[in-house]
Amino acid sequence: MEPEIYRRMGLTDAEFEKVKAILGREPNYVELGMFAVMWSEHCGYKSSRSVLKLFPTKAPWVLQGPGENAGIVDIGDGQAVVFKIESHNHPSAIEPFQGAATGVGGIVRDIFAMGARPIAVLNSLRFGPLDDSRTRYLMGGVVGGIAFYGNCLGLPTVAGEVYFEPSYACNPLVNVMAVGLIEQKNIRRGTAAGVGNAVMLIGARTGRDGIHGATFASEELSEASEERRPSVQVGDPFREKLLIEACLEIINEDLIIGMQDMGAAGITSSSCEMAARAGTGMEIDIALVPRREEGMTPYEVMLSESQERMLLVPKKGAEERIRAICRRWGLEAVIIGRVTGDGLMRIMENGRVVAEVPAKALTDQCPVYERERRRPAYLDEVRQRDLSRLPEPEDYGRVLLGLLAAPNLASKEWVYRQYDYMVRTDTVAGPGGDAAILRVKGTSKGLALTVDGNGRYCYLDPERGGAIAVAEAARNLACVGARPLAITDCLNFGNPEKPEVAWQFYQAVSGMSRACEVLRTPVTGGNVSFYNETESGAIYPTPVVGMVGLLPDIEKRCGIGFRREGDLLILMGETYPEIGGSEYLATFHGLVAGEPPALDLEREKAVQALVREVIAAGLATAAHDCAEGGLAVALAESALAGGLGAEVELASDLRPDFLLFSESQSRILLAVAPEARDRVLDLAREKGVRASVIGRCGGHSLVVRINGRTLFNLSLEEMGKQWRESIPVLMAR
């Protein structure tokens, strides 16, 4: 076989030799394609698998960790929550609407493949600067695609984040998280047990869309990528809705042994993963696969990533009942093969063997690389900058208004108003707060959901940035009163074959692992997205954390908005002169430099525990974490959310701009009734947390004084205008 054939599929010379050694012969074209997709970074995790072992994955409440379609955690009363996050970065860069739409469809299938009813979607998005017309095109397409698929499915998109940085200009990030609820007795896994059992394909017909989508997602983007539009799948959310209902009915009737979504690598991945988990094999006749296009080759059928398809292994005798259920939902259900006991994936076409490969060779024997790691030279340059010598602002009101208008901090209502976040009627707190809250019907419980990440911090210090991503997600849950349970992560990085990127990846995972250990948030699964890189360079290293938390009593929840005149403002935690990597530094000084804020995880843990206790006791009327933009922006956001101003008096030796815009970690702003003040301060003392009364809610302006000097007095109207109109105005250009 000519080297350019397997190289074009993404295999190296050494990997091709390993394939030959496993088979004892040269692979044919179909077999080569199967190895290429399953040994891609997207499916095989060959550059990340050894590093991912750093993550803590076990806890008494974790029912399913990494290795399945999605993670599962116990929430009591025989119920569990199923959740996972994945990326659809490369497809969205080429075809933003369909790339993002099918990102939603794929992650939702992972949820109901476990037997759970999907209940919510979240997303984490990264684009280039909004003054660029292509960025506006990409953002419009991505948001439209997410809205289209989620709204048509009848799933609320309840939370998310959107950031804009030059490093994402050519390579946007589209990370989508889905969440489901399940009775623990209904949990199913993707396994193909029982020799002789049928293998059924249900759902959509198979076409040529998405062929080699997995290998496309395992290479750098270039001008030639525009020609890869056939690698972008096309989604049909209405068919997926039918598929959800049919699959859940099949599970409720206990008709199957296992079920797997046909995502990346299509029939190839779903079949070999199910067989490998069970230690079995499969014989599949691709002539039986329903097709929507004529003349498809065995290679195309095996590698197609056509959407809205599931692979099932029914219990013996259940095949006709499954067909009847699918007919009722307007879906095809076809037996395409059977489970075998020889461990081989035997692919037939009308009685002819077109591929024969050991199932575990495709999964367990994927090469694992220990990539060379090297600290990037740029870190010395960006950290040498003496930020204490920056000029102080003359007009602090102008600075705050400018920060509120900065796209990273401005209202994202332009985005989330396109999503139906109230559908299903379980959304108690939707977009715009620190975390979304969904009720668990029939109980007093609530689920709290968030996604968080900061690529700028990770660019300056990936270990600290990774830890902060976990800490901030948990802090956001604490602000609504929820205890964090576990995380799913989406790790977005450049080319791992470059030592600097491999170093960033290792450092970020190390930091995340450290935070997960201290905060007791095990990792239940996720996704690694490498090769987010173009000729102009790599993206910022961007680990994104999706976190699920539990509210034992949904009535004891908190929001970010100031609600009552006369309530006192208490700042939990301490402020240090930490503006490295801050929004203030980037927006007003044009710099991405310095070190990101320090993170003391034990202090973080104490602050979060304190705030949860205060909220559970009914002592807080508002809670908001101090994150990007610092204390000043947190105050403005809470004032705008509640439609109520505040007067704040700070006493400090810090420079005013550092005090107001520092992004020091482990800080939460609380509003409490005056009569609750002493009890809250006593609780803080007991937990060793610094708590300072800094002001009072009231009026229609935000007034901030430092050491008796008024820094700004801004009306809610002028702040709201800057904050709300920024992104709509930019998108309308």
From Swiss-Prot:
Q: Where is the signal peptide?
A: none
Amino acids binding ATP = 45, 84, 489, 526
Primary localization: cytoplasm
CDD domains, alphabetically? Answer: PurL_repeat1 (cd02203), PurL_repeat2 (cd02204)
What reaction does this enzyme carry out catalytically? N(2)-formyl-N(1)-(5-phospho-beta-D-ribosyl)glycinamide + L-glutamine + ATP + H2O = 2-formamido-N(1)-(5-O-phospho-beta-D-ribosyl)acetamidine + L-glutamate + ADP + phosphate + H(+)
Keyword RNA-binding belongs to the record: no
Gene3D superfamilies found in the cross-reference section: PurM-like C-terminal domain (3.90.650.10), PurM-like, N-terminal domain (3.30.1330.10)
User: What is the recorded name of this protein?
Assistant: Phosphoribosylformylglycinamidine synthase subunit PurL
Which positions does UniProt annotate for Mg(2+) 2 binding? 110, 261
Q: Where does Mg(2+) 1 bind?
A: 86, 527
**UniProt gene name:** purL
| Active site feature | 42, 88
- GO CC annotation terms, alphabetical: cytoplasm
**Superkingdom of the organism of origin:** Bacteria
Which Gene Ontology molecular function entries are recorded, alphabetically? ATP binding; magnesium ion binding; phosphoribosylformylglycinamidine synthase activity
* Pathway the protein takes part in: Purine metabolism; IMP biosynthesis via de novo pathway; 5-amino-1-(5-phospho-D-ribosyl)imidazole from N(2)-formyl-N(1)-(5-phospho-D-ribosyl)glycinamide: step 1/2
**How does the record describe its quaternary structure?**
Monomer. Part of the FGAM synthase complex composed of 1 PurL, 1 PurQ and 2 PurS subunits.
Give the family this protein belongs to, as stated in its UniProt record: Belongs to the FGAMS family.
Q: Which UniProt keywords apply?
A: ATP-binding, Cytoplasm, Ligase, Magnesium, Metal-binding, Nucleotide-binding, Purine biosynthesis
Q: Identify the enzyme class.
A: ligase
Give the function comment from the record: Part of the phosphoribosylformylglycinamidine synthase complex involved in the purines biosynthetic pathway. Catalyzes the ATP-dependent conversion of formylglycinamide ribonucleotide (FGAR) and glutamine to yield formylglycinamidine ribonucleotide (FGAM) and glutamate. The FGAM synthase complex is composed of three subunits. PurQ produces an ammonia molecule by converting glutamine to glutamate. PurL transfers the ammonia molecule to FGAR to form FGAM in an ATP-dependent manner.
Query: Looking at the keywords, is Cell cycle present?
Result: no
What does the entry list as the binding residues for substrate? 87-90, 109, 233, 305-307, 529
- Location in the cell: Cytoplasm
